[in-house]
C-alpha cells in the first residue's frame, strides 16, 4: 500500500484534533473528488512500519482525539491489510482514541457482507472503527454545510452500535449540520 499524505493536526475529518492518513488507490473516481491524485495506487510513498511508528508518535499528545482514514479508498482490498496492522498497533497503545474512516463503498451493501477482499480482515477492520462515513461523493448532492461529509447521500455510521444491533445506526455525538448556526 502507498499513502498520499499524513496530516497531524486535522480538524475537518472527525471531531476534535485528529491525525489523518490519506491512503493511495481508489476505484470509485467520483466526479468532483477533492483528492484525485490519490486514485492511483502507486501515488505517494510506501506504507511501512516506519510510517506506522510515525503515526503512533503523532497520536501521543493528549489533545489528539483519534485517527481518521481517508483516501484514496481505505477499504480497497489491497489497502485493508496494512490499515488493520496500523489499527492493531494503535489500539494496543491508545485504546481511548477514536478511529474514523471515510469510504465510497456502502457499509451494508459492500463492506459488511465481506465483498471487498478477505472477509476476516474486513471484520477485524470494522472492529476497530468508531465511525464510518460511507457512500461515494456525489457532486450533485454536494453541500458545504454538512458536517464531516461532502455530499448529502453520505452517512455517518456508528459502527459499534450498528454491529451490535444488526442495523444501521447513525452517529449522534455531534452538534448538527452548519445550516442555521451562527
Region spans (language model):
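Glycine-centered loop/turn positions within well-structured domains
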Residues: 28
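Conserved Radical SAM active-site core
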Residues: 1-4, 17, 35-115, 120, ...
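Receiver (REC) domain switch/active-site residues of two-component response regulators
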Residues: 130
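P-loop/Walker A phosphate-binding loop and immediately adjacent motor/lid segment at beta-alpha junctions
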Residues: 86-91, 142-182
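Short, conserved loop/helix-junction motifs that constitute active-site signature segments
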Residues: 124-127, 150
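N-terminal [4Fe-4S]-dependent radical SAM core
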Residues: 1-22, 31, 35-42, 168-169, ...
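Short glycine-rich, flexible loops that bind phosphorylated cofactors or substrates
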Residues: 76, 140-141
